[in-house]
Amino acid sequence: MKVRSKKALFCSVSRLLHTERHTERQNLTTLFNRYVDKTDVFSWNSVIADLARSGDSAEALLAFSSMRKLSLYPTRSSFPCAIKACSSLFDIFSGKQTHQQAFVFGYQSDIFVSSALIVMYSTCGKLEDARKVFDEIPKRNIVSWTSMIRGYDLNGNALDAVSLFKDLLVDENDDDDAMFLDSMGLVSVISACSRVPAKGLTESIHSFVIKRGFDRGVSVGNTLLDAYAKGGEGGVAVARKIFDQIVDKDRVSYNSIMSVYAQSGMSNEAFEVFRRLVKNKVVTFNAITLSTVLLAVSHSGALRIGKCIHDQVIRMGLEDDVIVGTSIIDMYCKCGRVETARKAFDRMKNKNVRSWTAMIAGYGMHGHAAKALELFPAMIDSGVRPNYITFVSVLAACSHAGLHVEGWRWFNAMKGRFGVEPGLEHYGCMVDLLGRAGFLQKAYDLIQRMKMKPDSIIWSSLLAACRIHKNVELAEISVARLFELDSSNCGYYMLLSHIYADAGRWKDVERVRMIMKNRGLVKPPGFSLLELNGEVHVFLIGDEEHPQREKIYEFLAELNRKLLEAGYVSNTSSVCHDVDEEEKEMTLRVHSEKLAIAFGIMNTVPGSTVNVVKNLRVCSDCHNVIKLISKIVDREFVVRDAKRFHHFKDGGCSCGDYW
C-alpha cells in the first residue's frame, strides 16, 4: 500500500492500527513494515498519536524512540503525544528525556508542548518543574493555565491553585482576547476552593460559574455539589438548586446531593433522592451510591432501610467491596446492632485499616471496650498498621469505659511503637478519659503539657468533666479559654449555666443567660429520631406538631403513673431554671427522647427493640426513666446520643451509668 497524501496516510495508519492491531494483535514492527512510510515523520506522528489516544502508552513511547533512532527531524506535533504517554506511565525519566529533546529542537516554548510538559510533571508530582515550564511560556493560553491549576489541585496544593486562578483573572482582564476558562479548568478551581478554609470562597467561585454560564453542565455542577457537601456556606438549599439545574444528571450528581443531605442530617431527603434514582432507568447506581445511602442510614438510625440497602449490596455482589463493606459495618454499629456489624466484618474477605477501625469504633461507642481492645491487637497481628483515626477509636473506647490505665498505655505507644504523632483528637480523648474518671487535675496538667495549642474540643471535654464532678473553679478556667477560641458556641454557655445551677448559684446562671441574650445566641433545639416503616420521625422537646401527639402524651401520662408506683423520683438537676420543683418535673416529662420512646412502644409489636437517636447528650432524668420503662414494659431500648450508645434492658443500661 502506498499513500501519497499526508492526510490520507494519517487516516490510513489510524484506521489500520484500530482494526488490525486490536483484532489480529500484530506487533508494532509488523505494522510499520507493512503500512508505514518510515522515512516520513508525519507517518510516525500519526502512529504515536493513535497509540497514545488508545491508551497504549508504552508502545507510543517505543514508536517515538524508533522515530528518533532513524534521525528524523521531529515536528511540533511529535512531542505532545509522546509526553502524554510519559504522563500515563508516570515515567518521569522518559518525560525528562523527551523534554530535553523538545528543548534541543526548539519546541519548548510551543504552547502545546509546554502544556503537555506541565501535565506530565504535575502527574509525576514534580510541581516545581511544572511551574518552571509554566513561567517560561512567553504567551500562555487557557490550556496552559488550566494545566497548571489542575496540577496544583491534583497534588493537593489548593491554596496555590486558587492563587493561580486569581492570577488568571488578572491576566484575562488585561487581555483584549479575553481567555475563557473551560469546564475542565473550573472543575479544578472549584475542587481547590472547597479545600481552602476561607470564608465565602466556594460561594465566590459559584457566582463566577453562573456568570460564565457553566452552572448547568454536569461536570461543573457535580463539583459544586461536592464543594457544598464539604461545607459551603450556601447550605443544603443552594446545593439542591444546583442539582435541579443540572441538565443531564448522572450518577455522580445523585451521589453528591445524597451526600449533602446525609451530612446535613436530612436522611429522609437523601432516601427520597435514592428512591428517585432507583426508579430512573437511565442512571444506574454503584458502590459509592450505596455507601452514601448507608451514611444517611447511619445518621438517622433507620435500621430497616439499612437492611434493605444491605440486601441490595448482596444482590449486586458488592459485599466484598472494601468501601461498601466498611459502610455496612459503620451503619449497623450506628443503628445499635454491633453484633450484626461484627458478622459483616467477619465475612469481609479484604479488610483495610478503615474496616478494622470502623469495627473498633463500633465496639467503643457501644461500651464494649474489652472487645475493642481485643480486636486492636488482632488488627496489628494481621499486618494492618493502625493510623491516626484508629488510635482515636481505641482511646475513645477506653474513655467510654473509664479504662485510664489502658488509655495511657496506648497513648504512649502511638509514637514510640507505631510512629503516629498524637494530635488534638488523641489529647481530647485522654482529657475526656481522665476527666470523666475524676482525675480533673491530671487532665488539666496534660493540657498544660501539650506541644500544640489546645482547641475547643480539648477545653470542652474538660468543661464537661467539671459538670460531672461539680468543679466550678476549673470550669471557669475552661470556659474562659473556650470563649477566647469561640465565643459564639451556645453549648459552652449552657454547660457553664448547668454547672452554676448544680451549685445553686442562680445569679450566675442568670448572668450567663443575659450574656447569651445580648449576643443573640440561641440554644440549638434537642431532638430525637425514630424510624418506623421506612419513615424517620423527628421529635422536639414538648412537641406539638406530630400527628399522634395527643395519644403520645396520654401514653406518657400513664407511663408516668407506673413510674411513680415503681419508685421513680425525678432528677431535676438537669433543669437549668430557678423555678419550683413541680415546674421542673413538668419540663422533664416532655423531653424529646421520652416522646420518641413512647411513640416507639405504641407503634411496634411487644417484645421488639426500639431504636432512638438523640442529637444531644441524654440527661440524667431521661436516663433513669428509660431504664425503669425497659423493666415496666419488658422491652429493650437502644438510644444513641451525642456521646455513645445506651442499651436499656431489664431496668439497667449498658453504660453502667458512666456516660
Curated annotation (Swiss-Prot):
GO terms for molecular function: RNA binding; zinc ion binding. Keywords: Mitochondrion, Repeat, Transit peptide. Belongs to the PPR family. PCMP-H subfamily. Disulfide bonds: none annotated. Residues 1-24 form a transit peptide. The gene is PCMP-H34. Residues 458-533 are annotated as: Type E motif. It is found in: Mitochondrion. GO terms for biological process: RNA modification. InterPro entries: DYW_dom, E_motif, Pentatricopeptide_rpt, PPR_At4g14850-like_plant, TPR-like_helical_dom_sf. Its main location: mitochondrion. Residues 534-564 are annotated as: Type E(+) motif. Residues 565-659 are annotated as: Type DYW motif. PPR repeats lie at residues 40-74, 75-109, 110-144, 145-171, 182-216, 217-249, 250-284, 286-320, 321-351, 352-386, 387-422, 423-453. This is Pentatricopeptide repeat-containing protein At3g26782, mitochondrial. It comes from Arabidopsis thaliana. Pfam families: DYW_deaminase, E_motif, PPR, PPR_1, PPR_2.
